[in-house]
A protein has these predicted regions:
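Small-residue-enriched hydrophobic alpha-helices in membranes
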Residues: 1-145
Length: 145
């Protein structure tokens, strides 16, 4: 039996939330591989062992791509959000915002803005707080020249 890291519950919740917004439910295997690898690398930084991080991310991916109804998916996601303390809700939003900005080459179009708005609401972040996080992500993805 694998060792259970104390952060694993938070990692499961963060993965579920991030996947909801950045991973398509079907197809686009290259994009999915990139997202999964990024999440695993992030959780290694948090102190999880690689096999534990990969197991969590893959389990969340499998559930994300399952045939859950919209209501079941919403309830499942809400339970994940409720697990997270406020600082991890902010971190999850920052990870998503950085990914959205990076994927859109530092531009925030209507679709990207909608994703971030829905994520901020789901995570219960105030408008000023989510806007500040978005500003930081904008600076981080801005070209030097």
């Amino acid at each position: 039996m694998a060792d259970y890291h104390p952060n694993a519950t938070y990692v499961e919740a963060m993965s579920a939330i991030l996947m909801q917004f950045i991973v398509p439910t079907a197809g686009e295997d290259d994009l999915i591989d990139v997202c999964v690898n990024q999440l695993v690398e992030t959780y290694l930084f948090d102190g999880l062992k690689e096999n534990e991080a990969a197991r969590i991310v893959n389990a969340q991916l499998e559930l994300h791509r399952s045939g859950l109804s919209a209501d079941d998916r919403s309830n499942w996601l809400r339970t994940k959000v409720d697990i997270l303390p406020s600082e991890l809700k902010e971190r999850t939003f920052a990870m998503l915002a950085h990914r959205v900005y990076f994927a859109s080459e530092g531009r925030l179009d209507g679709e990207a803005a909608d994703i971030l708005d829905r994520a901020a609401k789901l995570l219960g972040l105030s408008s000023p707080r989510s806007e500040k996080i978005i500003e930081v992500c904008e600076v981080l993805t801005c070209p030097i020249a």
